[in-house]
């Protein structure tokens, strides 16, 4: 009986042992399967991360390989506009090297040609357009409302764009730089250089809105100082000499604003004013070199360079041109032509930098 009982107990013990072994084996199997699943998930995550990194690298490579084409429409060839264009190109080339190319076109002073040039730029789907001078900017603005348009050598954007209550931004695909020198400062220069003069003639092209704006503004400043001011306007280069002669006949001195037609005709103006002995104060350096005695001027190369920096910010950094404020020239310089000042008997006070006539 005792032997039977012992046999039963041994059998029960063996059964429990087998059950325990089976449970351990199942647990081991489950653990192995869980480990395999975890490893598979980790591997998949690593593969996804690697894929994302590869995509990012490809995108970065694509960005670094991107090239840009910029159209430049310049109204006319003269020193100031040439310098602005050169500064603009240099700024972009400094930052982008051979990743930027320029299609540079000159309209030879013809506004309709500006329109043709800018329409071609738009047809070619260029990345950005520079309008150098008011007529060029106006043509670019008329040609596109999607491609970014920057202006340079623009005196007053409100006048150029027909915007009332100008605030400094356009809210559109347009911004740029202004070459407007302080007209009150120019009036001050005239007063210190020509204290005995009474009659001032303002000589400019009637078809240039920026010149009209400057003439109207500085006329007020000069009249406040006691000068009698008369405007003498020409419609194009054909009547520059005749109008200049009229101005010289009736003026003690002549003021010429930043006027593109005048800038292109300085030799013709000088050929009349020099024999007449009438001094000319100008709104910018290039005109002063050609026919003037003094100026309060900006540096047009620097102005163009600043415009190029704005272009880079738009093209590469994604700046919103519609909210970019129009930028002004950083510095203004009093300059004079010594030979002309001496010939006319003008005493130039300290603070003026000597420049060479052309």
Predicted regions and their residues:
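An alpha-beta-alpha
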Residues: 70, 88, 175-222, 320, ...
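Pocket-lining segment of extracytoplasmic ligand-binding domains
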Residues: 209-278, 284
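Flexible loop/turn connectors
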Residues: 286-339
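Bacterial lipoprotein signal-peptidase II cleavage site
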Residues: 19-43, 50
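Extracytoplasmic "Venus flytrap"
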Residues: 65-97, 103-113, 207-211, 259-264
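Sec-dependent N-terminal signal peptides of Gram-positive bacterial secreted proteins and lipoproteins
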Residues: 2-24
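Hydrophobic alpha-helical segments within soluble ligand-binding/sensing domains
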Residues: 63-64, 157-199, 298-319
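Beta-alpha junction/loop-to-helix N-cap segments that form part of ligand/metal-binding clefts
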Residues: 104-165, 259-283
């Amino acid at each position: 009986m005792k032997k039977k009982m012992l046999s039963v107990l041994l059998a029960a013990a063996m059964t429990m042992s087998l059950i325990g072994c089976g449970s351990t084996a199942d647990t081991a199997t489950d653990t192995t399967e869980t480990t395999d699943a975890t490893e598979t998930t980790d591997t998949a995550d690593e593969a996804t991360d690697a894929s994302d990194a590869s995509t990012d690298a490809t995108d970065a490579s694509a960005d670094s390989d991107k090239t840009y084409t910029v159209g430049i429409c310049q109204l006319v060839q003269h020193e100031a506009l040439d310098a602005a264009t050169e500064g603009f190109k240099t700024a972009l080339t400094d930052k982008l090297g051979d990743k930027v190319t320029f299609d540079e076109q000159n309209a030879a002073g013809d506004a309709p040609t500006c329109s043709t040039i800018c329409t071609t730029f738009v047809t070619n789907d260029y990345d950005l357009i520079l309008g150098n001078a008011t007529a060029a900017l106006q043509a670019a603005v008329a040609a596109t409302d999607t491609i970014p348009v920057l202006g340079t050598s623009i005196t007053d954007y409100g006048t150029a764009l027909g915007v009332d209550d100008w605030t400094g931004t356009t809210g559109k695909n347009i911004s740029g730089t202004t070459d407007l020198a302080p007209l009150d400062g120019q009036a001050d220069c005239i007063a210190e250089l020509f204290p005995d003069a009474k009659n001032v003639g303002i000589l400019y092209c009637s078809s240039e809105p920026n010149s009209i704006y400057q003439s109207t503004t500085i006329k007020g400043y000069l009249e406040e100082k006691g000068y009698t001011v008369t405007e003498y306007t020409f419609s194009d280069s054909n009547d520059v000499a005749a109008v200049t002669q009229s101005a010289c006949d009736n003026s003690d001195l002549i003021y010429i604003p930043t006027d593109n037609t005048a800038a292109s005709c300085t030799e013709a103006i000088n050929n009349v004013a020099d024999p007449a002995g009438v001094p000319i104060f100008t709104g910018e350096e290039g005109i002063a070199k050609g026919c003037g005695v003094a100026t309060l001027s900006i540096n047009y190369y620097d102005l163009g360079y600043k415009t190029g920096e704005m272009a880079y910010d738009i093209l590469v950094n994604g700046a919103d041109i519609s909210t970019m404020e129009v930028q002004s020239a950083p510095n203004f310089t009093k300059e004079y032509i010594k030979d002309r000042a001496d010939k006319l008997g003008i005493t130039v006070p300290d603070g003026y930098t000597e420049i060479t006539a052309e």
